[in-house]
From Swiss-Prot:
PROSITE patterns (UniProt xref): COPPER_BLUE (PS00196)
Transmembrane segments: none
GO cellular component: chloroplast thylakoid lumen; chloroplast thylakoid membrane
Membrane topology note: Peripheral membrane protein
Cofactor entry: Cu(2+)
Cited function: Participates in electron transfer between P700 and the cytochrome b6-f complex in photosystem I.
Pfam family, one: Copper-bind
Residues covered by the Plastocyanin-like domain: 67-165
Keyword tags: Chloroplast, Copper, Electron transport, Membrane, Metal-binding, Plastid, Thylakoid, Transit peptide, Transport
Protein name: Plastocyanin, chloroplastic
Organism for this UniProt entry: Silene latifolia subsp. alba (White campion)
Localization (cell): Plastid, Chloroplast thylakoid membrane
Length: 165
């Protein structure tokens, strides 16, 4: 029987005798100092202008937003939701079929501000929004109170009112 033996010598380096180099050299470093192009006061003024412009844009966008009126309540009722609303002059109202019953939006010619032509703001009585999600939009500019109804369901109480300020 043969026996194999192996012996290896491993050398482990020792750092005990090493000393840190303490060589010092004089070095010259140029540092560029950035000079502000505007003063802090001018910078804060610019920030103020940006904040004011952003706020003004938000206010104007808020005035241009559309009001939404659902045609049919979530429980299937024949109603405009909301049935009474106030908007700013020039604000768009979007009437959206919520329930899938055929609905329309007709403004009552006797219940709008004087001089308003209801044929220009109403849907024709024979036109209907049949499917959920179908929409009709109108923008009212004349200040006053406008009453509207759904022609197929007015007898069931599907009426509404919008006040334009």
């Amino acid at each position: 029987m043969a026996t194999v033996t192996s012996s290896a010598a491993v050398a482990i380096p020792s750092f005990a005798g090493l000393k840190a180099s303490s060589t010092t050299r004089a070095a010259t470093v140029k540092v560029a100092v950035a000079t502000p192009r505007m003063s802090i006061k001018a910078s804060l003024k610019d920030v103020g202008v940006v904040v004011a412009a952003t706020a003004a844009a938000g206010i104007l966008a808020g005035n241009a937003m559309a009001a939404e009126v659902l045609l049919g309540s979530s429980d299937g009722g024949l109603a405009f939701v909301p049935s009474d609303l106030s908007i700013a002059s020039g604000e768009k109202i979007t009437f959206k079929n919520n329930a899938g019953f055929p609905h329309n939006v007709v403004f009552d010619e006797d219940e709008v501000p004087a001089g308003v032509d209801v044929t220009k703001i109403s849907m024709p009585e024979e036109d209907l929004l049949n499917a959920p999600g179908e929409e009709y939009s109108v923008t009212l500019t004349e200040k006053g109170t406008y009453k509207f109804y759904c022609a197929p369901h007015a007898g069931a109480g599907m009426v509404g009112k919008v006040t334009v300020n």
